[in-house]
């Protein structure tokens, strides 16, 4: 479990600070405060089956620049949505995952999973949006040097983006190498 607070250094003027949000022209608060929190739970069953859940969120009474707002969509958020597809000053998201046993062949490991992700954000204006998805994924590693992650998420509850509709699928994938 974790809790963190972030704030500005009491510098800047709102007329200058608004230059960070030329898209939405939201007039962000120059002296903002944000409280962020998170908690997680992991349980390993017999025969290498695993369960994991995580909750994260934030609260702010101020209008925030885009970089400080809570973002829901993406590979590390609500999978099945594009990165940061829904944003707000206040929000929470939850991830629930079930992992199948690891398959090993020599130095290679492969594990499959199923997941449900959901979240809700509220903007300073008072508008709120909730989104959710469900899907499956793979985690693979070769020695300790290479890893692969792939998640395919199906939108269960769509947000405001007319190009991300209920029933749509999106794949998030990454390949990493450590030297």
Question: Predicted segment positions?
Answer:
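C-terminal transmembrane beta-barrel domains of outer membrane proteins
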Residues: 21-179
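Hard-cation-handling environments
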Residues: 1-18
